[in-house]
Amino acid sequence: RVSVTSSINTWNENESLNSRIMVAGGGGGGYYNSDANYGTGGAGGGLTGYNGSGTNGPGTGGTQVSGGYDKSASSFGIGGFGYGGIGTRWTYNASGGSGWYGGGGSYASSGGGGSSYISGHAGCIGVNSSGKSLTSTYSKVADSISYTGYKFTNTQMIDGQGYPWTIVKSSASSGMPSPTSASLITGNTGSGYAKITYLGS
């Protein structure tokens, strides 16, 4: 975020959300019920989050321009800009993962994953200072650049299942770098990580 929030405990102020220049999509929540049915949440995405699993209203993944939703009723469980949708049933449900746009909450299945965003990355769609998408369909790199003007170069985007993304998802999974070792991992459990390495002299 280029614009900080007014308080460390406040995450959803519009000016700050609109100024984000790099976002990692989060995975949706899983579910389990008394009939021993269960399912994993949709993985955090590249340009698009993964849909949740299950047959009873799983959440869909967030995209570059909209949040996911409950597949059984598209007007419920809707994720938004910077947050996942909530589960739409009082039990046996799961919420969507956060992200650039969050995944949808479920009815009685698992939640969808959120989408990722990098300002300057081909395929991403930025927003203006009011939080409105610059375009509905990506066509040029300028579409991806945040209104703040800050952007990244030589970018790499890898989703929670280990697939790299440019304008489209790669056909082969490569894994993603582990934040704690030199190994590659597929997805991450627990809290997220930000690893910054100074490359100057």
Go through each PLM region and give its residues.
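Low-complexity, glycine/proline-biased repetitive segments and flexible coils/loops
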Residues: R1-S201
